[in-house]
Amino acid sequence: MIASADLDACREMIRTGSYSFHAASRLLPERVRAPSLALYAFCRVADDAVDEAVNDGQREEDAEVKRRAVLSLRDRLDLVYGGRPRNAPADRAFAAVVEEFEMPRALPEALLEGLAWDAVGRSYDSFSGVLDYSARVAAAVGAMMCVLMRVRDPDVLARACDLGLAMQLTNIARDVGTDARSGRIYLPRDWMEEEGLPVEEFLARPVVDDRIRAVTHRLLRAADRLYLRSEAGVCGLPLACRPGIYAARHIYAGIGDEIARNGYDSVTRRAFTTRRQKLVWLGLSATRAALSPFGPGCATLHAAPEPEVAFLVNAAARARPQRGRSEALISVLAQLEAQDRQISRQRLGNRANPI
């Protein structure tokens, strides 16, 4: 059970740092809302630990600090699954969730792997690569939410992953300019090249034009397809959980609608939704959930998962979760450690041979 003080700290962290999820979570039943706040708080801590790991804005030094932040998160996750969490509210709360719900370790490890990809500065040549990244930093959270609702049906898990993918594609579309000014690009490189926009040109001078608008539009169309398909899985969730998940779907899709209203300009403008809009979507979500038992079934419930999320579906559907580190995470962490050792050797060499 999550300690009340830890839950209060997690709730405050989400209230001030994740407005969209905080709004949607208000429609979840308390038995799901409490562990979901712990889950999102731990994910937020992990994300912030890497995003905020900077060293005076120097690109090379920042990358080193980010690598060390990921390695520290690895150790924190080990402590969580060892039943000895770090003495911090989010860690203690998430450890309680892991124990109560038998959370498959592969799911939070997937998030950590995605953060490790950020730390090594990975970019993505194709849309499939973007989905690989989105699977780790967002669809994994969708799968974990299903576990908190005690739903492990593979079809429902696949649709939850669709929703996570769609949300992350929306985030990428919203943050095109912010990311570019930080030297990062999450858009598919081949889509940019098809529009005649070299990635290096855009990173050197992030300006809005028809080329970047077209890529952003295309990404949001892909998100819309996934949002629509994700709806088929909502009816596989407990009735009391459906309003909150519909709300998450509508609130995040609404960000994409705002980007469209801005002419697909995410370089000079940042899309946001108002409190009034969120209230409207919360009302719509409650209505849709109330009517959901009387609606027809949807054939897309049984659609195969996107190949990039199949490993998440398989992990979450297992009756007995694996507790050891996955091979994928071991590989990317080894890469981070090797880079760290190389930098240390270079520094020792520089001190031994001063100019």
Curated annotation (Swiss-Prot):
List, alphabetically, the Gene3D superfamilies matched: Farnesyl Diphosphate Synthase
| GO terms of biological process kind | carotenoid biosynthetic process
Highest taxon of source: Bacteria
The family database entries (Pfam families) matched by this protein are listed as: SQS_PSY
Enzyme Commission number(s) of this protein? 2.5.1.-
- Example GO molecular function term? geranylgeranyl diphosphate synthase activity
What pathway is this protein a component of?
Carotenoid biosynthesis; phytoene biosynthesis
Name the cofactor(s). Answer: ATP; Mn(2+); Mg(2+)
How the cofactor is bound: the record states: ATP is required for the transferase activity but it does not seem to be hydrolyzed during the reaction.
Assigned keywords, A-Z: Carotenoid biosynthesis, Magnesium, Manganese, Metal-binding, Transferase
SUPFAM superfamilies annotated for this entry?
A: Terpenoid synthases (SSF48576)
- Family statement drawn from the similarity comment of this UniProt entry: Belongs to the phytoene/squalene synthase family.
Cite the NCBIfam families for this sequence: PhytnSynCrtBRhod (NF045921)
Q: What does this protein do?
A: Involved in the biosynthesis of carotenoids. Catalyzes the condensation of two molecules of geranylgeranyl diphosphate (GGPP) to give prephytoene diphosphate (PPPP) and the subsequent rearrangement of the cyclopropylcarbinyl intermediate to yield phytoene.
The protein, known as: Phytoene synthase
The gene from which this protein is expressed is crtB
